[in-house]
Amino acid sequence: MVTIVLGAQFGDEGKGKITDLLSQSATLCCRAAGGHNAGHTIVHDNITYDFHILPSGLIAPDCVNLIGTGTVVHLPSFFKELDALKAKGLKDAHERIFISDRAQVCFDLHSVVDGLEEASLAGKKVGTTGKGIGPCYSDKAARRGVRIGEVLEEGVVEDNLRKLEAGYRARFGELNYDLEEEIGRFNEYRTKLQPYVVDQMTFLAKYRSSPSILVEGANALMLDIDHGTYPYVTSSCTGVGGAIQGLTLNPTSIRSIIGVVKAYSTRVGSGPFPTEQNNAIGEKMQTIGREFGVTTGRRRRCGWLDMVMCRYSNSINHYTSINLTKLDILDDFDEIKVAVAYKLDGKRLESFPALPGVLDKVEAEYVTFPGWKSTTMGITRWEDLPANAQRYIQFIEREMGGVPIKWIGTGPARTHMIEREV
């Protein structure tokens, strides 16, 4: 049976920790979409691991890992990340990671184009990670991309890469890019990559009867190409639909869909953010929460928890349970606010706006809670939480239509987690 872990907000919710926890009993852990633009940090046995393209199930010694068909794979990053895990003691990681032969190749050329496209937007930049994800997915949709399986065939990458480079040069002029160097590197990858490449359908068939398959979502619903705050989104489907499509999952095999919700809100890059706090409150969240992007190092914008957004996210992903993260970051706030509705020109909106221009103008309507002003760091039992923290959590559950908050993060370590019987 399949468990899917998905971000319910703008990403950076802390999906890696619950994935790490669940992967200890999983047979298989998979990435379904996205690329090395994702970033998960996991603290395990006092060692900090940063994951980007690799599934974080690699930390679990008995868990096999798959990078699925819906992803885009930057091979230099793949091998660099794998080497970093080995250096930190995961010596057998290379034996437990596989890539679908139908996944797309993300080239250095795509990163160059990403930067040029962002620059051309001037004051309306999307705020991408600059990793080339958007241009790679664009080439996939235009049917001119290169698949992982084609890297193993002599001459295929060179022919296609020369065509891609010529097309982008015709569009942008001379590029700050070494075509011959990248072609040469892929000639080396032709042999180096071979042990990792699999036919996803055949590979997954071996695990169909597995009691525990874990899907690790990347980014989050509000960055989904269809359902997010378009155009300030990533270029893949980040919700449950993307997981099913990217891994060819049987929908009837899905046992649970876990929505990961940070106890406050953050966003990296441009785009509307109705509950953003451009003030001392936002600065305090940023400082205490160490809100810097794992992938880019950029400062994350911070604000109050937005239940309008979370309800919208739930209506698309249909969460069966919630993992609330980073509760401890709110320990020292005198009062805590939660957005429960949007108003535009004094009138409550009935649905989540599709247009970014409307989202930029809405006024958030808040419910205010007294803070608990005591530490929750490291608490592992519900009954040990301060009463005001319990009320805050129960309110979120009600606002989510009764979806239970089963896990509550109270610190960075794997052990800093409350698991409730719900």
UniProtKB/Swiss-Prot annotation:
Active-site residues, as the UniProt record annotates them: D12 (proton acceptor), H40 (proton donor)
GO molecular function: adenylosuccinate synthase activity; GTP binding; magnesium ion binding
Annotated pathway: Purine metabolism; AMP biosynthesis via de novo pathway; AMP from IMP: step 1/2
TM ranges: none
Record's catalysed reaction(s): IMP + L-aspartate + GTP = N(6)-(1,2-dicarboxyethyl)-AMP + GDP + phosphate + 2 H(+)
GO cellular component, one term: cytoplasm
Residue positions binding substrate: V294, T295, T296, G297, R298, R299, R300
Cofactor entry: Mg(2+)
SUPFAM superfamilies: P-loop containing nucleoside triphosphate hydrolases
EC number: 6.3.4.4
Binding positions (GTP): 11-17, 39-41, 300, 326-328, 409-411
Top-level taxon in the UniProt lineage: Eukaryota
GO biological process: 'de novo' AMP biosynthetic process; IMP metabolic process
Keywords linked to the UniProt accession: Cytoplasm, GTP-binding, Ligase, Magnesium, Metal-binding, Nucleotide-binding, Purine biosynthesis
Pfam families, A to Z: Adenylsucc_synt (PF00709)
Chain's role: Plays an important role in the de novo pathway and in the salvage pathway of purine nucleotide biosynthesis. Catalyzes the first committed step in the biosynthesis of AMP from IMP.
Record text on subunit structure and interactions: Homodimer.
Protein name as annotated: Adenylosuccinate synthetase
